[in-house]
Structures are given as C-alpha cells and as structure tokens.
C-alpha cells in the first residue's frame, strides 16, 4: 500500500514519511519537518524511488504540512480505493496518518489488555488528537487532556485540568487510580 499512498502524496505539498520495521524514510522534507526529525532516527531521501521497499512491510505512512485545512482537503481528494483500505487520522496539527484498516490505538489497547489479561472494563485511555479517538472510544474510561481537539473532548467522559505538557497523566492517576 506504500506505493499508492506515496504516489498520491507526491502530488501535494507535503513531507512524506514511510515507516518500516527497519527504518523511517522521509521524502520531500521541509525546514519545519527537518527540525522535528532531529529527534527520531530516519533516512532522508532526495529521490522519488520507493521501489526498494517492495520487500519490506510498510506499516504506516504520514503526510506533514503545517496547514491542517490543507491536509483535510487532501483527504477529501484521496481516491476511494485508498480510503477503503486505510485508517486515517490526524495528529499534532501537522500530520495526516495512514495505517492499514483496523490498525489504530483502540485495537492496540484491546490487544494489549487481552495480552495482559486486563478486562476492558478496567482500562483508561488518555488522548489529545484524532489519532487517539479509537482508543478513547474503546477504553472503559476515555479521558481528554485539557488541550485536546474538540472531537476528542466530545468523545471522552472526562477532561483533565492539565494539558499534555503539564502532568495530565499524573492528574488521571491521582484522580482515578490512587
């Protein structure tokens, strides 16, 4: 699925990240994204060749642009064939993320809880952006941090006083667990 996503994204003004188990490949980067990328291991590519990935599992892709409305318009223009096979979400007001259908944080929470023999009615999820929506809905208690996007606040049963940079997780632990 990496090739169709890559070809589609190449028609837009976005940096493209392709994630394999071995490496993150970044195409069409920009100064804002270069600054962020100093924090993660990656290989910056200066060509448009992704055929070397044909024997690799590309488990995630994302497009980056600082204009969220531009990314939303891009999603509207995405072919139905891609929409049908992808989970699409947004994060950090700069990314549109693509995972295979059924791969999302809600499914991950359910898998982890099952693996650890934790009943779902004992789970709490904390989120701030659209990529957390499935997890917020799946958990017994969905919590939005103070600076969460409106969609997350609407889906959550509780909103913290603190934001994601001000100990929101500690607030949740103190309020609901201890």
Label each PLM-derived region with a short phrase.
Residues 97-178:
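Mg2+-dependent phosphoryl-transfer enzymes with acidic/Ser/Thr/Gly-rich catalytic loops
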Residues 1-3:
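Short, small-residue-biased leader/transition segments that mark boundaries at the very start
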Residues 8, 12-126:
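Conserved acidic, metal-coordinating active-site core of Asp-based
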């Amino acid at each position: 699925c990496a090739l169709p996503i890559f070809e589609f994204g190449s028609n837009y003004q976005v940096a493209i990240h392709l994630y394999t188990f071995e490496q993150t490949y970044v195409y069409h980067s920009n100064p804002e994204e270069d600054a962020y990328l100093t924090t993660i291991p990656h290989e910056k590519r200066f060509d448009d060749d992704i055929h070397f990935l044909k024997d690799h599992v590309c488990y995630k892709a994302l497009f980056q642009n600082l204009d969220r409305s531009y990314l939303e318009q891009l999603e509207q223009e995405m072919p139905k064939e891609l929409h049908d096979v992808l989970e699409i979400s947004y994060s950090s007001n700069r990314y549109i993320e693509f995972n295979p259908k059924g791969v999302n944080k809600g499914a991950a929470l359910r898998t982890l809880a099952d693996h650890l023999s934790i009943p779902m009615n004992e789970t709490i999820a904390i989120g701030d952006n659209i990529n957390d929506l499935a997890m917020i809905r799946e958990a017994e208690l969905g919590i939005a941090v103070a600076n969460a996007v409106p969609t997350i606040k609407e889906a959550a049963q509780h909103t913290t006083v603190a934001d994601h940079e001000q100990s929101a997780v500690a607030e949740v632990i103190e309020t609901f667990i201890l």
